[in-house]
Amino acid sequence: MYSPKRVKLNVTSGMRKRPETGENNDDLYPPTALARNGISPYFIGKPRRKIVVETPSDSAQQQPPFKSRSQQNGLDDELDGIIIDEDEDRTVDVSFSQKQDTRKLKSRPFLGEKSSFKLGEIPKPKEEKRREEPFTMRGFDFGSDDKVTKIRDKICDIVDPTNARRTDPNFIRQMHENTLKGIEVASNPHFKKTRAPTKNRAAIQNTLGTLYPSFTTAAGQDPQNSKFQVPLDRQSSSQSIGSLAGIPPARRAPDIPKRCSNPLIRKAMGMDTEGGGKDEKMSGLRAEPTLKHFDENIISLIESEIMSVNNEIGWADVAGLEGAKKALREIVVLPFKRPDVFTGIRAPPKGVLLFGPPGTGKTMIGRCVASQCKATFFNISASSLTSKWVGEGEKLVRALFSVARLKLPSVIFIDEIDSLLSSRSESEHESSRRIKTEFLVQLDGVNTAPDERLLVLGATNRPQELDEAARRRFQKRLYIALPEPESRTQIVQNLLVGTRHDITNHNLERIRELTDGYSGADMRQLCTEAAMGPIRDIGDDIETIDKDDIRAVTVMDFAEAARVVRPTVDDSQLDAYAAWDKKFGCLPPPSISR
């Protein structure tokens, strides 16, 4: 059985040294013998480098560093059958001729051959200095490029605006050469732009004296003779320092803190709390101490809900509803105009609920109240007091009442209040319950003053869904019923103002009979449909007909419109409203003819 022999690694050549015993390679393990000879395909040792044998002409010029030619030839024959073993501490001196061709000394790694380099001859590549080749232009003619041609044409327009030299061949050749020269200079990577020479003091002073001959300093002196002039050159440092000796040192301005616009950052830095942000003057509602705990975006959101009533709406614009209008005058208008009279037991209620079928004018009554009481009117919906962030809804409700108390007298009108103050149940979300609780506390809680002129006016068409606590806080619950026959006649007369018609009192009686059970919104839609009757009779002549030639609106148009526009309120809903008003209402139900 073959067994591998322990061999010693040759440090110089990287080969394994032959065993000292005279055994034959045939007696060794085959892979060991192949690896020892350096011809095994599995040999993973350090690869040897083969030195290309020199030509006779080159070898004749090179002299051996240690031995003569005869001794060297004998040494070459001796090295054909042995492997040189060198010690690690031995150093080899190598010298080459400067005229030797470096291409013949290239070495390449190989496997399976014996080393044939001479003793002391270790190839070393010759270092060559890299010469910097001069920049040369490409063979492409950039002068014929489209962009270059456009630029050259613009330059020609500046140089020769009259086009007198455009046909001159010398001018064309000169412009073409200048273009190529400019491209060559701009494309040269070694090109460095020369800096303009700096002007000395005398040149600058002469220039200033030429441009501004009558210029003097604030003291009336000549700027050239002034002792406060700044040195313009650095040639004499002693003169520069001497000229600045009389100038007092400039004091550094104190650092002015920048105003932070992000409310979250301002709150984190303590700039919105008491004692913070003293360098900044707060203005508007943000300066109020009661609003210091709210963010600026919350206050801005509440301010955006303040409605300015540009068109004044009177009680006469609200047809019918005499009982509701009388109650609202006593609750809202008169206490706001005479707060000295309505005090103590005469203090008005803080909550008024308007309920009834849709389209009866509840929102219009709210606009009329805002116009008549001359108070700050907040038009609030459920979306104004809700947020996707937990806890923000309660802050919005609290901020709403805080801003309203700062702008007394105030009226907070909440349309469709049932979506905000519906009955609390176990299945509702916790955030909705907290918003309702905060609203009820702000409406009538411990911190509310009894004589403050703040009114919450709510409107809903589903009063049976309101929470019990909310129903108690609305002391006045007014039923806004369907318009009575006289109210429907008044609505038709108000809507036909400005429209040509032939409606008489007898026709109004006919319209009153046709519109039984109609709400205020249904009456408006009926009048709009009747007013379109004359327009439909014109047909295709609408583009050419004169406005005065359009016929008037008649009772027949109302009869045709009544066939299209039907009442939107069901009798069962009217019965439910009447039952709730009988149980919780504050006004006697009006008599409605059906």
UniProtKB/Swiss-Prot annotation:
Catalytic activity, as annotated: ATP + H2O = ADP + phosphate + H(+)
Summary of the knockout phenotype: Sterility owing to depletion of germ cells.
Effect in UniProt of substituting R472A: Abolishes ATPase activity
Protein purpose: Has a role in spindle assembly which acts in the progression through mitosis during embryogenesis. Required for fertility.
One CC-aspect GO term: nucleus
Enzyme Commission identifier(s): 3.6.4.-
PROSITE patterns recorded: AAA
The keyword Nucleotide-binding belongs to this UniProt entry's keyword annotation: yes
Name of this chain's protein: Fidgetin-like protein 1
Residue ranges with Polar residues bias: 56-73
Cofactor needs: Mg(2+)
Keyword terms of this UniProt record: ATP-binding, Cell cycle, Cell division, Hydrolase, Magnesium, Metal-binding, Mitosis, Nucleotide-binding, Nucleus
Catalytic temperature dependence: Optimum temperature is 25-30 degrees Celsius.
Organism: Caenorhabditis elegans
One GO MF term: ATP hydrolysis activity
This protein's encoding gene: figl-1
GO BP annotation list: ATP metabolic process; cell division; positive regulation of mitotic cell cycle
Residues engaged in binding ATP: A319, G359, T360, G361, K362, T363, M364
Family note: Belongs to the AAA ATPase family.
Subunit (UniProt): Hexamer.
Keyword RNA-binding on entry: no
pH dependence remark: Optimum pH is 8.0-8.8.
Resulting phenotype, N461A: Abolishes ATPase activity
Record's subcellular location: Nucleus
Tissue-specificity statement: Expressed in germ cells.
Gene3D superfamilies given in the database record: 1.10.8.60, P-loop containing nucleotide triphosphate hydrolases
Location of region: Disordered: 1-79, 239-261
